Amino acid sequence: MPKIGMEPLRRKALVDAALRTIGHHGSLNVTMSDIAREAGVSAALAHHYFGSKQQLLLETIRSLLRDLRRDAVAALIRASGPREKLSAIVHVSFQSDQFTPETVAAWLAFYVEAQRSEETRRLLVIYSRRLRSNLMASLNRLCPPDDAARIAEGAAALIDGLYIRHSLRSAPLGLASAPALVEDYFDMQLKSFPDGQRAKPSIRTL
């Protein structure tokens, strides 16, 4: 029987091991035994805590989303003003820990899995909606609602597209240039609204 109080530690160890194992394999074509071995526990214990590989993989996605949300909340709290908050979102999206080999492999594998798994797709939709919500919270204070929605969609597409290109090492520019491209997009789109819009109370975060 697992020791009392060990479950949270074991679950986290298994999630971390799942991330590393996916990174090593470059896909979700891994087994519970592979993950358990990486975590230093038995496959039976892994099944005890998660029931199936699918449930463990879903928890791994949730863990990535929680980490991203935590970093976004901290960055938005530090930022002052809507334009600075947009920059904070951009820099969190391209921070170095999002580009570790295991994290990159996991995100790309989960996008592929979303074509087959409704639950995986739902979690990735949550990520997309949170990103758009964060962008809209600041853009609504800088330009009219219709323009805010349009700019948010463009920025989200840039962020996701640049992430994928850099993940696949197919981008002609270095990773350090990616945030600057999104910042240039914001500057170009917002130059027609130099005075911004009336401030709207909004504290939406990832």
UniProtKB/Swiss-Prot annotation:
Residues 31-50 bind DNA. Residues 8-68 form the HTH tetR-type domain. Pathway: Amine and polyamine biosynthesis; betaine biosynthesis via choline pathway [regulation]. PANTHER family: HTH-TYPE TRANSCRIPTIONAL REGULATOR RUTR (PTHR30055), TRANSCRIPTIONAL REGULATOR-RELATED (PTHR30055:SF228). Keywords: DNA-binding, Repressor, Transcription, Transcription regulation. GO terms for biological process: glycine betaine biosynthetic process from choline; negative regulation of DNA-templated transcription. This is HTH-type transcriptional regulator BetI. It comes from the Bacteria. Repressor involved in the biosynthesis of the osmoprotectant glycine betaine. It represses transcription of the choline transporter BetT and the genes of BetAB involved in the synthesis of glycine betaine. One of its GO terms (molecular function) is DNA-binding transcription factor activity. InterPro entries: BetI_C (IPR039538), DNA-bd_HTH_TetR-type_CS (IPR023772), Homeodomain-like_sf (IPR009057), HTH-type_TetR-like_transc_reg (IPR050109), HTH_TetR (IPR001647), Tet_transcr_reg_TetR-rel_C_sf (IPR036271), Tscrpt_rep_BetI (IPR017757).
